[in-house]
Amino acid sequence: MPRRREVAKRVILPDPKYADRVVAKLINIIMLDGKKSTAEKALYGAMEIAAGKAGEEPVKVLKKCLDNIKPMLEVKSRRVGGSTYQVPVEVRPERRVSLAMRWLVKYSNARSEKTVTDKLAGEILDAYNNRGSAVKKREDTHKMAEANRAFAHYRW
């Protein structure tokens, strides 16, 4: 238990265009070297492209895309008597969203399109349609948890 007072959680203000906290958080994850306006342009452009192809509202497309990426289970290493077990644990709701966002940005950057906007739009659309690298990452995480189900009683 920490002896100091608990640190207050920073409140993230909603983004200016869609007035949505999830979009604001994703902008912060995309941002490099403090260039927020560049990150905003990239994400807003990607959301418009994805929404145009999906035929829905940009925020709805993004939220459905993130829902398709969110992991329900993950594995954590637990050392028991000289050997390390991969113990499956349920993912906290805030961590689900943050992992989904990080995976979305990571795998969109690994894509072969030319601009960041196109890369993001492509990965958002793929995740929206339940395919793509970020969704594969979620499936792999779930498979890993399922494979180590025998160690679930080591949860803490």
UniProtKB/Swiss-Prot annotation:
What is a biological process (GO) this protein takes part in? translation
Question: What NCBIfam families does the record tag this protein with?
Answer: rpsG_bact (TIGR01029)
**What is the organism of origin for this protein?**
Geobacter sp. (strain M21)
Q: Does the keyword Ribonucleoprotein apply?
A: yes
- Tell me if Endoplasmic reticulum is a UniProt keyword of this record: no
UniProt cross-references to InterPro entries, sorted A to Z:
Ribosomal_uS7 (IPR000235), Ribosomal_uS7_bac/org-type (IPR005717), Ribosomal_uS7_dom (IPR023798), Ribosomal_uS7_dom_sf (IPR036823)
Annotated protein name in UniProt: Small ribosomal subunit protein uS7
Q: Which domain of life does the UniProt lineage start with?
A: Bacteria
Q: How does it assemble?
A: Part of the 30S ribosomal subunit. Contacts proteins S9 and S11.
> Lineage of the native species?
Bacteria, Pseudomonadati, Thermodesulfobacteriota, Desulfuromonadia, Geobacterales
The task this protein performs is described as: One of the primary rRNA binding proteins, it binds directly to 16S rRNA where it nucleates assembly of the head domain of the 30S subunit. Is located at the subunit interface close to the decoding center, probably blocks exit of the E-site tRNA.
- Print the keywords alphabetically: Ribonucleoprotein, Ribosomal protein, RNA-binding, rRNA-binding, tRNA-binding
Recorded hits in Gene3D superfamilies, A to Z, give: Ribosomal protein S7 domain
Name of the gene this protein is made from: rpsG
The positions making up the signal sequence are none
Show the GO MF annotations.
rRNA binding; structural constituent of ribosome; tRNA binding
